[in-house]
Amino acid sequence: MCGIFGIIFAERPRRPLGEILRRGLERLEYRGYDSAGVAVVDRGLVVKKDAGKVAEVAQRYGFDSLQGVVGLAHTRWATHGKPDQVNAHPHVDCRGVIAVVHNGIIEKYAELKEELMKRGHVFRSETDTEVIAHLVEEYKKQGLDTFSAFKKALSRVRGAYAIALIDAENPRAIYFARNLSPLIIGVGEGFNIVASDIPTVLDHTKRVIAVRDGEYGYITAGEVYIEADGVPQDVAARIEEIPWSAEMATKGGYPHFMLKEIYEQPESLASTAAGLEPAQIETVANALLAARNVYIVGAGTSYHAGLTLAFILPRLRITPIPVISSEYAIYEDLYDKDDLAIAISQSGETIDTIKAVKAMRERGVKVVAVTNVVGSTLSRESDVVLYTRAGPEIGVAATKTFTTQVLTLAAVYLTALRALGHDVAEHQRELKAVPDLARKTIEKTAGTAKELAKRLRQRHSAYYLGRGAALPVAMEGALKLKEVAYLHAEAYPAGESKHGPIALVEEGFPVIFVFSDPNTGEKTLSNVAEMKARGALTIGTVPARSDYAKKLDVAIEVPQTSELFAPILHVIPLQMLAYFTAVERGYDPDKPRNLAKTVTVE
């Protein structure tokens, strides 16, 4: 939520600095925002900001004409103060020489604000962020240099934050700090960058340093300096080369990132399968079999991916405990050194998941991370990391990261199954075939999903039903429809639909069934009949050449595979259905309202 991009050059870049900042803002749009702004130093501090889309604000205030060698850009998601010109970032001090941008929430900021106002500081906004600019100003008044004043200000601040600050009186540095909110440094030649995440820096560099919780420092055009508790850190050893290209973070000819990322799934699955490290997978599988309790932790789509594993683990005589990240405290008294947690997060920065993992580790729980981002907070807080290799996912609604997470978890399950003496050769062959099956699924189902979207366009609600291992797929399908098409959708176990939900079913009410679990298909057909009898429009994802199709009004056939990999194939037409329904209803699926790609506040 919110986004930061700051860059400093040794000399004036060939393109105007404001244009570079504007392009950085465009890279941040996928994170979700309601306001945008920039600050540059050019014979003094210049700040331009307002509520609205990046393109609109940039044109209104002439971002592309701004010159200089150091600047900050920010997309804001309102938490304190309404989204308007005054509350948009950057914020400045009383004299208009310090500009600050901030992601997160400053706790008890009102007390600091009151203290500063008593000392004569004048506040312009309702935000918590503005406090930081005035604190630094106050300590500079006391004779401290900018960095010392910044550090002293940080000692007064509590909460989750990523901060970047520039000072027109010392314009050769960008100061930064991080606590529980993602922040990276992009390392260049003759320039350096501070940013919220990796896709934002790919136009400039692939070399990054992940700033850790509790760290602060500054960048100049030729130096990266980081401290923690007053101790300088070895930054050279922490530089990582990111295997993503700038082109991977563009639409590549598709109308939307979401559609592009749906179509990228065969490649992402192949990359993830090829990148599975047998030794690591075996370590996780053995830990799974040895654990007293197994917690599967995630939020949103990542939670649904975790459920695909949770629903089959009982076959290994393991009773999993699925944990929605924000509800981790429910099981706090149970956490023990003999337990295992599998924590899943696309970004590796989801605040609820990070907090859950930290609470578990404090009690000795071994943590396995499944994430898409190298060097993320989750990867550093975990004992073992399994990386999905989906490439950058820009669309707010997760698609390819869900299927690569499912594939990774299925590989762990297979290895545990083999450790128990089972023959998994056929499953291994299926794993290798999944990328090609995903490609065939996209080719065969896109047209049906597009036509079906026209029928859903005028509907107000829908049910997604599945039994057994099909339920997580139904849950993910319903979430996608809500996220991008703004069409109310609920997922239930198909058998549970009789206990209340069926009361809402009337003529034409869409009910989408998922037939990905071969053990429950026949029972699910009885629910199809119940819904049809009440006038529902029955839709289903079904294995090719099965008899299920005959019982449905609309059948979307996907290639046959085992229930272990079926969630990957059955979710693809549901992703496309959500996408095309959003387009039919006139919404931009890449920028769903009220949503952010990475949720970094509680």
From Swiss-Prot:
GO molecular function: carbohydrate derivative binding; glutamine-fructose-6-phosphate transaminase (isomerizing) activity
UniProt cross-references to InterPro entries, sorted A to Z: GATase_2_dom, GFAT, GFAT_N, GlmS/AgaS_SIS, GlmS/FrlB_SIS, Ntn_hydrolases_N, SIS_dom, SIS_dom_sf
Reactions that this protein is recorded to catalyse: D-fructose 6-phosphate + L-glutamine = D-glucosamine 6-phosphate + L-glutamate
Broadest EC class assigned to this enzyme: transferase
Residues in Glutamine amidotransferase type-2 domain copies: 2-222
CDD domains reported in the protein's UniProt record: GFAT (cd00714), SIS_GlmS_GlmD_1 (cd05008), SIS_GlmS_GlmD_2 (cd05009)
Taxonomic superkingdom: Archaea
Subcellular location: Cytoplasm
EC numbers: 2.6.1.16
GO cellular component: cytoplasm
GO terms classed as biological process: carbohydrate metabolic process; fructose 6-phosphate metabolic process; protein N-linked glycosylation; UDP-N-acetylglucosamine metabolic process
Keywords: Aminotransferase, Cytoplasm, Glutamine amidotransferase, Repeat, Transferase
Matches recorded under SUPFAM superfamilies: N-terminal nucleophile aminohydrolases (Ntn hydrolases), SIS domain
Residues at the catalytic site: 2, 597
Residue span, SIS domain: 284-422, 452-592
Oligomer and partners: Homodimer.
UniProt function note: Catalyzes the first step in hexosamine metabolism, converting fructose-6P into glucosamine-6P using glutamine as a nitrogen source.
HAMAP family tied to this protein: GlmS (MF_00164)
Protein's UniProt name: Glutamine--fructose-6-phosphate aminotransferase [isomerizing]
The organism of origin for this protein: Pyrobaculum aerophilum (strain ATCC 51768 / DSM 7523 / JCM 9630 / CIP 104966 / NBRC 100827 / IM2)
